[in-house]
Amino acid sequence: MVSTNAGGIASKQASSMAPNPGKATILALGHAFPQQLVMQDYVVDGFMRNTNCDDPELKEKLTRLCKTTTVKTRYVVMSEEILKSYPELAQEGQPTMKQRLDISNKAVTQMATEASLACVRSWGGALSEITHLVYVSSSEARFPGGDLHLARALGLSPDVRRVMLAFTGCSGGVAGLRVAKGLAESCPGARVLLATSETTIVGFRPPSPDRPYDLVGVALFGDGAGAAVVGADPTPVERPLFELHSALQRFLPDTDKTIDGRLTEEGIKFQLGRELPHIIEANVEAFCQKLMQEHPQAADKLTYGDMFWAVHPGGPAILTKMEGRLGLDGGKLRASRSALRDFGNASSNTIVYVLENMVEETRQRREEAAEEEDCEWGLILAFGPGITFEGILARNLQARARARD
């Protein structure tokens, strides 16, 4: 596994924005990936070869999808070694759920462990200081759940208070931040470890004309893990990155079939409706307005152009529809598009990668003494099965203060 982390910005200049007492902050971020790096240019030939498929129409469709996703690289658990050990995974109609879960359960725990350790190292605290664990995954099914397996792998206290969010899909990372925020603000002194971990191996299958949605997954989704330490009232040695204010979850009635996944003996069967970008476009502005109204001081003085946007990149069409609906210039979703390009849609993990990109952008602007101003306020957004919208109004505590009259 490959892991990395992002914590406070290494700069002689202290944070320009002071945190508010009692408000939850993201104190550190981290991520980890499996060893298999997939270059998008080689996906089509490799996938068709590994699944023994020579259908020219399916190959042409997958080729087109791989270009339109804008993904360049991804990491995946699936490997030639796994296919040699479990050739039935690439065969149509084989009951392989047990094999898939055996592989997935082990992989998500390993990735979550490495991402968590990277995050804690960046934070600078000790694992013994972690009071709560929030674990998010849509890639496993077992009990005890992955939250306990992760707590044991990390050597956390048996008294650590655990929460697991399962099958929340792409909205799971922001949902986890929302839960971590609530815990941090309601339990003085709490330090909450959020970990997300996902793999596509549960849905890997040979292509079929009857399942065109499978090819979307092949072209778009990636594996990995993310982590964050969340706590209120940072100590002098902690370096908070983002302060979390109002949080909102909303499901859209009568849209539950738009993102649909069913566990079967052959793995998960996934369907993604073509109407998803249009549904998000039609509902995102009202959701953002509601989020901002929860904090009137921010709502009164902010326009969309004044804000940063940390958006889960479900796909390029979703980002483009959002830009058009909200009137955002192309640079506002740069962190999201970069995450999609480098890691694909890694489900719940991806929002961590987006936030890390934003931290890095802020660091680079400071080092280069760029004239471009940092946005203090912004929204962290994701969209998942339900259709469920998750959002948090946040402050970038690493932002440089705007000049005021």
From Swiss-Prot:
Phenotype caused by lack of the gene: Defective pollen exine and Ubisch bodies patterning, shrunken and aborted pollen grains, and male sterility. Male sterility and defective pollen walls. Altered composition of lipidic and phenolic compounds in anthers. No significant reduction in sporopollenin accumulation.
Known EC number: 2.3.1.-
Active site, renumbered: C170 (nucleophile)
Compartments, record wording: Endoplasmic reticulum
Molecular function terms from GO: acyltransferase activity, transferring groups other than amino-acyl groups; tetraketide alpha-pyrone synthase activity
Primary location: endoplasmic reticulum
InterPro entries registered for this protein in UniProt: Chalcone/stilbene_synt_C (IPR012328), Chalcone/stilbene_synt_N (IPR001099), Polyketide_synthase_type-III (IPR011141), Thiolase-like (IPR016039)
Tissue expr: Expressed in adult flowers.
Compositionally skewed regions (Polar residues) per UniProt: 1-18
Family assignment from sequence similarity: Belongs to the thiolase-like superfamily. Chalcone/stilbene synthases family.
Name of the protein this chain belongs to: Type III polyketide synthase 10
The organism of origin for this protein: Oryza sativa subsp. japonica
The encoding gene: PKS10
